[in-house]
Amino acid sequence: VEGGSGVNDGSFNITVEPNPTIDVRVAIISVTVEDATVSRTVTVIQAPQAGETGDDAWKSKEFYHRSLVLRFTADWCGYCPQMASALNDAQQALPDKIETIAVHGGGSSLQTEASSALAGLYGITNYPTGVIDGLSYVPNNDRTKDLIISSVKETEDKYDAVSGASWTSSVSGRNVNLNLSAYIKEAGSYKITAFLLEDNVIAPQTDYKNGDQPDYAHSGIIRSAFTYPLGESFTVEEDYAVKDFLYSVEVPSGSVVDNMRVIVYVQKLDEDTSRYYVDNAFSAAVGVTQSLQFVTDGWGTGNEGVKPGEDITF
């Protein structure tokens, strides 16, 4: 009020498009008065629609695809840090397109029964070795990064992703609980695998290039298996099915829950080759809800990380 004090009331209307996802969408709106002395932040929450544009929306959408790289490694392996570096470079070249697991074997101090089972499945005898989507084997050399990238692109060129996953995870005492749903578009034979991984595990690592490292930060270490390590088999009789799974595993002594994440991948049987390949892979920190992810509109709200004053998208 000019020349004095008082209160001005104001209002505005927001019109949004229908929510085509199967998740609640959240956006943040910041409102600031002209002289910037007063501001308010409003959170807008939009429920999903029912029917074909709600619960069934996933059927007409294209799943976002990520490849899975199993990096077979060991703490005594002096060449293994080089492959880890090449894999990191490949991830930088293909942002948010590669999920990884560091599969320790060969007597490594970080070896588990699950990692031993994976090494047996893929016949691993040499370290390091990379296996991409269960299809391609990559050795350690000066072309490792390029081979990983080309293998990831080869999977996407050959197969359309027909699986998606969503889940919630929670901690109860020393247990991590996982409530998981797999969304499958095509009838066929499948396997689902879920591991509890730990990042930033400080332990020695032999390194022929940079010298042995007593405090190497190991990431993507398998700590526990929610499922059978080689995958829990299931069959989809008709197109468009949802399979639900419920698991709980104990956090190993000495592990830090804040450094742990859940990784899930779905394998599909290729009827032409009688071989399973990784159709899609996903990961999220323990306690973080994983939503279905689509190519067409991103995933979740489309406004993750939006701060007051930034643009929002509905």
Where are these regions (language model features)?
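Surface-exposed binding patches on compact interaction domains or structured appendages
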Residues: V1-T15
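Short, solvent-exposed loop/linker segments at the N-terminal edge
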Residues: S5-G6, S169-R174, N303-I312
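Short strand-edge motifs at loop-to-beta-strand transitions and within beta-strands
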Residues: G10-I14, A241-V249, I312
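A short beta-strand micro-motif common to beta-rich folds, especially ectodomain repeats
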Residues: F12-I14, D23-D35, F314
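C-terminal edge beta-strand
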Residues: A36-A50
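Local sequence-structure signature of Cys/Sec-based thiol-disulfide redox active-site neighborhoods
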Residues: D56-V103
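Short, solvent-exposed loop/edge segments of extracellular or virion-exposed proteins
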Residues: R71, V295-K307
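Short, conserved sequence motifs used for protein processing/export or organelle targeting and
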Residues: D89, D96-Q293
